[in-house]
């Protein structure tokens, strides 16, 4: 296990932002969100009074409460009384009672990314941007830096299993964080190092449906780097590669491509482990094994290795951190193998492998399917999928049809709206019809998450790999399946 408490960290005096001396209590509207909770935890550990509200309890709210934060359920105007500043995410609507009250009381209101930018202002910021892979890449950078004794502060969009949290206040100069392009709020950040993993059309409502506006915003983000900063770019992604001539900043590239400055060769996946050799200019080849499956995770690791190499971290720390990496919650999270008997035959009892994954964009789903196929080619792949947002389903409809047709058995939940109004023809029944017309598989529509365990009992057979996939409330399904459907671990 990579310890997140380093004993030989570089000397660094943690100071609160001097101009924030007037701030005593910081209130978070929607404190249970991963990004919000992470920043709240760092500020709490810096000595600020933290309060917050959300509409439901989750692991983040429970953890923050245990750490000393005041967390209440429900958004009410009186929740912000006594707050010096109110922090909101882009998910909070303008008519939110607490937001309205803050404006009436002239309490400063800042976006989540603005507060993250303040934390980064007096540190060596490493920001990870891109459509996919941000959480895993950020986690890998943090793990390598911790293994090397650099004791970083980090704010991650998922639970880093080795730390038991998605955030930590370190004692060094380093702050490692995700940079969120979904609402263009990453423009607030001014890091020393920026990683761009890939760029695809997603969250296009923010960019008025104009892909060029999305690209221009990425360039603007990278121009926030100082002239002595570093842009770490995935050369395997053609869109990212095409941006490099526009940057006017020092760059380091990574990928499987021969053109990459940090390159992977001789890749081989065995179950959940990916082994490969890293080539870097002027350095000896480095043979590593990453405790994550799939080529997409190799790319994430290469980005982390590029940053670590630039910071002078030794190869032994890099190799050790990748090998011991314990993963992130809901990123190809392996729940285990569970005993199951075949109810419809006289076959011997077998087992089902259960994996949960957060991926909800067609490219992410495709990468997860590929990793499952390469690691466990003999298993029948059963996917329980929940589309996320009607707008994404509408905009990427044919891509979803193509990728979801690649599994052996598909159980489809209704679209998780995330507050959006339903869009005609972009619902799960429509997706099922379109997939069925392809003639490859016959998807099963499942109305609610509560109905899924019963459906699975009738579908699963010994030897299956069950993959629960999506970003909505399907996230709680894997644990429930493990206890209600697959109760005996083998």
Curated annotation (Swiss-Prot):
Q: Name one Pfam family in it.
A: Mur_ligase_M
Q: What metabolic or biological pathway is this protein involved in?
A: Cell wall biogenesis; peptidoglycan biosynthesis
| Statement: the UniProt record of this protein carries the keyword Cell wall biogenesis/degradation | yes
Instruction: Supply one GO BP term.
Output: peptidoglycan biosynthetic process
Q: Which UniProt keywords apply?
A: ATP-binding, Cell cycle, Cell division, Cell shape, Cell wall biogenesis/degradation, Cytoplasm, Ligase, Nucleotide-binding, Peptidoglycan synthesis
The chemistry this enzyme catalyses reads:
UDP-N-acetyl-alpha-D-muramate + L-alanine + ATP = UDP-N-acetyl-alpha-D-muramoyl-L-alanine + ADP + phosphate + H(+)
Keyword Nucleotide-binding assigned to the entry: answer is yes
Q: What cellular-component terms does GO give this entry?
A: cytoplasm
Q: Where does it reside?
A: Cytoplasm
Q: Which residues form a coiled coil?
A: none
Q: What's its EC?
A: 6.3.2.8
Q: Which residues bind ATP?
A: 130-136
What the entry lists under PANTHER family is as follows: UDP-N-ACETYLMURAMATE--L-ALANINE LIGASE, UDP-N-ACETYLMURAMATE--L-ALANINE LIGASE-RELATED
Q: Which HAMAP family match?
A: MurC
Q: What does this protein do?
A: Cell wall formation.
Q: Which family does it belong to?
A: Belongs to the MurCDEF family.
Protein name (Swiss-Prot/TrEMBL): UDP-N-acetylmuramate--L-alanine ligase
Organism of this sequence: Idiomarina loihiensis (strain ATCC BAA-735 / DSM 15497 / L2-TR)
Name of the encoding gene: murC
């Amino acid at each position: 296990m990579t310890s997140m408490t380093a004993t030989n960290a570089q000397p660094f005096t943690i100071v609160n932002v001097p101009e924030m001396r007037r701030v005593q209590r910081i209130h978070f509207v929607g404190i249970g969100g991963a990004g919000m909770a992470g920043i709240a935890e760092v500020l709490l550990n810096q000595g600020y009074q933290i309060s917050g509200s959300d509409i439901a309890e989750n692991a983040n709210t429970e953890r923050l409460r245990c750490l000393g934060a005041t967390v209440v359920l429900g958004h009410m105007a009186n929740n912000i009384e006594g707050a010096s500043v109110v922090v909101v995410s882009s998910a909070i609507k303008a008519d939110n009672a607490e937001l309205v009250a803050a404006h009436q009381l002239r309490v400063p209101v800042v976006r989540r990314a603005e507060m993250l930018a303040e934390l980064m202002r007096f540190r060596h910021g490493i920001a990870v941007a891109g459509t996919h892979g941000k959480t895993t890449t950020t986690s890998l950078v943090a793990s390598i830096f911790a293994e090397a004794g650099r004791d970083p502060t980090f704010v991650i969009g998922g639970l880093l299993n080795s730390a038991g949290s998605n955030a930590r206040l370190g004692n060094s100069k380093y702050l490692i964080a995700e940079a969120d392009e979904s609402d263009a709020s990453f423009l607030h950040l001014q890091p020393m190092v920026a990683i761009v993993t890939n760029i695809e059309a997603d969250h296009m409502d923010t960019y008025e449906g104009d892909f060029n506006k999305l690209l221009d915003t990425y360039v603007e983000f990278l121009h926030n780097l100082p002239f002595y900063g570093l842009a770490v770019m995935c050369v395997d992604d053609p869109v990212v590669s095409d941006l490099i001539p526009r940057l006017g900043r020092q760059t380091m590239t990574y990928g499987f491509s021969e053109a990459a400055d940090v390159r992977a060769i001789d890749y081989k996946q065995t179950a959940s482990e990916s082994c490969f050799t890293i080539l870097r200019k002027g350095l000896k080849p480095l043979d590593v094994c990453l405790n994550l499956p799939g080529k997409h995770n190799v790319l994430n690791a290469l980005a982390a290795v590029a940053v670590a190499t630039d910071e002078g971290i030794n190869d032994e720390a890099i190799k050790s951190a990748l090998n011991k990496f314990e993963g992130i919650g809901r990123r190809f999270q392996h729940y285990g193998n569970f005993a199951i008997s075949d109810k419809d035959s006289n076959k011997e009892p077998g087992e089902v492998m259960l994996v949960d994954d957060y991926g909800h964009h067609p490219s992410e789903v495709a990468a997860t399917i590929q990793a499952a196929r390469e690691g466990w080619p003999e298993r029948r792949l059963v996917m329980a999928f929940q589309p996320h947002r009607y707008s994404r389903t509408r905009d990427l409809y044919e891509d979803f049809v193509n990728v979801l047709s690649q599994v052996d058995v598909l159980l489809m939940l209704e679209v998780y709206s995330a507050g959006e109004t339903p869009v005609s023809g972009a619902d799960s029944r429509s997706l099922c019809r379109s997939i069925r017309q392809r003639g490859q598989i016959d998807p099963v529509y499942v109305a609610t998450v509560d109905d899924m365990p019963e459906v699975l009992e009738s579908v699963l057979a010994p030897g299956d790999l069950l993959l629960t996939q999506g970003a909505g409330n399907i996230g709680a399904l894997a644990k429930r399946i493990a206890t209600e459907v697959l109760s005996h671990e083998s």
